[in-house]
């Protein structure tokens, strides 16, 4: 059955059974017991509001990857337009460092807000875990802003 979690003025989040959320300084962690990965959500107030949400989502994602010196092919970014938001997502696997890591990073952007969601795990544990995390992000919905 799962549960619905509301972050006031931001989003409704639908967590499947076994998932829990905990707030940290400036972000939220979504975790499931005995899972090899976690989802991190970061909430961002948009400063520049003239760029359409789908284009802004791609810009946020590219800027974040560049700031962290993550080498990525721009054509690997997938875009999605939702009725209430633009979405940009990329998968990145680091297999060169000692601790191999797989990130799936999303930016969901509406007219005034942006959310960065990142699923982080060992690439050996890819599979249904990352699929379930992706479904959580796909079901995330912005609460309509009173500023629109």
Residue ranges and their predicted role:
Residues 2-59:
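Secretory pathway targeting signatures of secreted, lumenal, and periplasmic proteins
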Residues 2-3, 18-19, 72, 76, ...:
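Short glycine-aromatic motifs
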Residues 19, 116-148:
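Surface-exposed amphipathic alpha-helical segments
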Residues 37-40, 86, 112-118:
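Glycine-rich, often proline-containing surface loops adjacent to acidic residues and nearby aromatics
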Residues 61-111:
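Signature of long, low-cysteine stretches enriched in small and polar/charged residues
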